[in-house]
Structures are given as C-alpha cells and as structure tokens.
C-alpha cells in the first residue's frame, strides 16, 4: 500500500518538480510561489491528493456553517466529500418539512389487498350479520325503552299537566261566577249538572275553588272544581237549608287536587261557602281518616261517625285516600256557626 506522501514545501525554486514528476507552476499555483499568496477563497482549502491516496484519506471535520446553515464560513463550497453533502442535503430537506419515510406497517396497509374469494366473502358477510339472540335482545331493549318513555309521559301528564289545566279551568269558572254576581244575574233555585253556584274557601289551606252541581268526573271534578252530592240516592242539602248535611267531593291528587291537604285541618278551623247572597261559615268538627267508598252513611243528615248528636246544619268533605289511590275515602265534617249576608261584608274568617 502506498503511504501518504508529504507535500513539498513551496519555495522560491520554481524550477523544481513535484513529487509526481510535474514541475511546479507559476507563482500563485499550488507548489509555485508561496501558499499564502493563493486566492482568498481557497486559503482554507486542504491540499489536493492524488488518486492513489484517496482510500487512505483521513476525513476532515466539516467546515463551520453560517448562521443560516447554508454553507461554510467564507462562502466556499461544502467540504467533507459527497457523503457529507448528501447528509447535509437530507438534513436541509428534513428541516423544510419533507415527509418522512413511511413505516413498514403503513406501507403494508396502503398496499393493494388481494380480492377475496366467494367463500371468504360469504364468511365475512355472515360474521358481520347479527345473530338471532342479538336481534332479540335489541328488540326487547327497544320495547323496554319505549315503555319507559310512555310511562314517564303518562306520569308527567297525570301529576303536572292535569293540575295546570284544571287550575286554569277552575279559575275561569270562578271568574265567570263572580262576574255574574257582580252584574246582578240571578241564579235559579236549581242548577244543571256541572253548573257552578258557589265558592268554597278553606283559609288554612289557601284554597278557593268553585262548587258545581253534581260529582261528574268529566264535567266537575276533573275540571278542578268540587262537586255537590245532588244525585238520587246521594242527594244532600244546600247550604241555605234550615237543617241538613251539605256534602262535597273533590280530588286529593291530580286535576287541581283541591282536597289534597284536608287531613291537616283541625277542630275549629273555618270552612266558608260563598254564594250570591250570603256567606256560610262552618267550623271543622271531626275527621274520619279511612273508610270504605261504599260507606254512604257519612252523607246522612246526621252522620253517625261525625260525633253530632242531633239535626243541624253540617258540611261534609269527601276525598280519596291514601294519596295517588282511590282505594278508600277520607271524611271531614264541619258545623255551621254563622250565616252572614254579603251586604254586611266578608266574615272574619276571610278578613284575617
């Protein structure tokens, strides 16, 4: 192997030959004149080597780059050979956002797939198709969801919307009744089923509700009013009767629920019936928390379980119990303590 040959020092002897048998050139060329007198752009360039020493060349460190990273200081070409230049070019392309080489997995995914055979296609189609158990479970789940939504809507209708509608209807009926009284329109001695003729006040419960003839659910109770027992077999007295029991029915839950809290009444609490001409003031006397719906004796002129001992002017309030059911009935009784003409103003129970 040929060893590295040291370069001859350039001197003044311009007639001496190079180590390769070539004469030194003129002043300013490599080997002719002084090396310091070479071109300014080539002052840092390493000495050229012949082809025989390329394999043994010691790689030179890369030339320092400028701030922009585009070349060596001094504006000269990149050093380090073609391999270094290729690496520098790759680095520059990477900094400029060139796409990276795709991973083998991505290349495999992008590679075209071979078409499936008919058997494989049918097998995949059967695998994607849900089984009978899955279809049945989905159908049952949809049925349960639909049933739950319908039940929620029904509960919302019963507990909220029926009250909203019944309150509006009852308020309108009370307003119409008061307008008729203010205009001097006289009420007949008897009333049609569903016709309002009085107002019921329960101050402790903040209840003011129209009283209509009959206990029809459609015409009276479901419209937020309370009904007067006036049908044959359950006919009760009117408030202006000299003796008798004035029987009323009302909802405890839903449809305005005017009697929802009558279980909170205590003996002595006032119950007032307002008509076109008079106020009839009753005092709560007793309560029967639970009784059968068929116990119609609670509407007798002198109810046996009320504690009254003889004929008098009584009032009976009936409603369902427990709440949200109609299995039993709750009964509240009261006794009249004052009959006051409207010309004398409101009774104390409505003023205080």
Curated annotation (Swiss-Prot):
Residues 1-132 are annotated as: Disordered. The chain crosses the membrane at residues 140-160. Pfam families: Sortase (PF04203). One of its GO terms (molecular function) is peptidase activity. Residues 1-139 are cytoplasmic. GO terms for biological process: proteolysis. Belongs to the bacterial sortase family. Class E subfamily. This is Sortase SrtE1. It comes from Streptomyces coelicolor (strain ATCC BAA-471 / A3(2) / M145).
């Amino acid at each position: 192997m040929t060893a590295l040959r040291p370069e001859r020092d350039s001197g003044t002897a311009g007639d001496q030959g190079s180590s390769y048998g070539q004469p030194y050139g003129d002043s300013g060329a490599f080997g002719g004149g002084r090396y310091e007198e070479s071109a300014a752009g080539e002052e840092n360039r390493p000495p050229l080597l012949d082809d025989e020493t390329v394999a043994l060349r010691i790689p030179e460190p890369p030339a320092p780059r400028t701030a922009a990273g585009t070349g060596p200081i001094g504006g000269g070409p990149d050093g380090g050979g073609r391999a270094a230049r290729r690496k520098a070019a790759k680095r520059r392309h990477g900094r400029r956002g060139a796409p990276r080489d795709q991973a083998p997995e991505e290349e495999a995914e992008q590679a075209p797939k071979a078409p499936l055979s008919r058997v494989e296609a049918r097998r995949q189609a059967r695998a994607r198709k849900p089984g009978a158990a899955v279809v049945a479970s989905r159908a049952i789940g949809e049925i349960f969801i639909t049933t739950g939504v319908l039940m929620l809507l029904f509960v919302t209708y019963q507990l909220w919307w029926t009250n909203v509608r019944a309150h509006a209807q009852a308020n309108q009926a009370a307003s119409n009744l008061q307008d008729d009284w203010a205009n001097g329109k006289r009420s007949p001695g008897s009333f049609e089923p569903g016709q309002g003729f009085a107002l019921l006040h329960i101050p402790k419960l903040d209840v003011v509700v129209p009283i209509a003839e009959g206990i029809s659910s459609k015409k009276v109770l479901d419209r937020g009013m309370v009904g007067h027992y006036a049908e044959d077999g359950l006919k009760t007295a009117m408030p202006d009767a000299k003796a008798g029991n004035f029987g009323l029915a009302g909802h405890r839950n839903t449809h305005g629920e005017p009697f929802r809290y009558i279980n909170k009444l205590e003996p002595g609490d006032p119950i007032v019936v307002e008509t076109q001409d008079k106020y009839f003031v009753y005092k709560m006397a007793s309560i029967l928390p639970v009784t059968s719906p068929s116990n119609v004796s609670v509407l007798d002129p002198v109810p046996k379980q009320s504690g009254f001992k003889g004929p008098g002017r009584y009032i009976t309030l009936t409603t369902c119990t427990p709440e949200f059911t109609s299995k039993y009935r709750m009964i509240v009784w009261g006794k009249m303590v004052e009959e006051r003409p409207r010309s004398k103003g409101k009774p104390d129970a409505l003023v205080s």
